[in-house]
Each structure stands twice: as structure tokens, then as C-alpha cells.
Amino acid sequence: GSFAGGWTSSKLIASGKSLDASRKWVIWLGAIFVVPGLGCLYIESPYWAIALISFALFATQFKQAALFTLPIDLFSKKDAASVWGITGSAGSFGAMLFTPVIGWLVDTISYSPVFVIVSFLHILSALMVMLFIPKIQYVGTISTT
């Protein structure tokens, strides 16, 4: 998924799409293609369940390829590492908080709500990119006017 997402973004840029359009297209495509993984909750075949989960994981990594480049796209070389450190720490902290919730959901209900929550968090993250980063562009091209 990561290779395909990076390749797709590069091809879109090479074809004349803006950095903003190519990154957001890859982010949205990945976010949307995670959702069909929910089908694994409704089928009995373990093979199809594995196929759907694999497709959702592929889509996750497809999306991540564009997300991983955002600090490099938006910040100077000097600041990009710090931004990644902060986002990595925030992600680890979020995982730490969410782990007991997952355990509780699985113990009291099932894996179903976990799959639903995780699927729609991808849509939420794409929406947050749209909201908080209206235009993805290289640091050297940011206008201050």
C-alpha cells in the first residue's frame, strides 16, 4: 500500500496535478477504501474476511504514504523532524489510551465496534487534513501576503 500510494502521488504530480491535489487525492482514496473492510463483519468465509481486511490494510498504507510526507511538504528540513517527533508521540499516546477501550469493547460487545470505529477514523483524519491544511504546498512557496 505504501509503495502504491507514493507511486500514485508521484504520478499525479508528474501528470501536472498540484502537490495539494495529489496528496489529498491519495489520502481520500485510501480513507474511502478502508471502509469496505467492514464487510468482513458480515460474511462467513474466513478467506473473504481475510481478503477484505487485507484490502483495508492496503488502503491504510496507501493513505499513509501521503500523510507521511506532510511534515516534509509543510515544514523546513530543520523543523520536519521535530514535527514528526511530536506527531509520533501523539500517535503513541493515542494508541496507549485507545488500547484499554479496544479490550473493553471486545470483551463486552465484540470486534464489530472496533472495526467500525477504526474505519471511520480514516474518514475523520482525511476531513481533518482538509480542515487544518487547506493547501498543501512546499515551504519555499508559502505566501505571507
Give, region by region, the residue ranges found by the protein language model.
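Alpha-helical transmembrane segments of multi-pass secondary-active solute transporters
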Residues: 26, 83, 105, 114-118
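Transmembrane alpha-helices of Major Facilitator/SLC transporters
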Residues: 1-13, 30
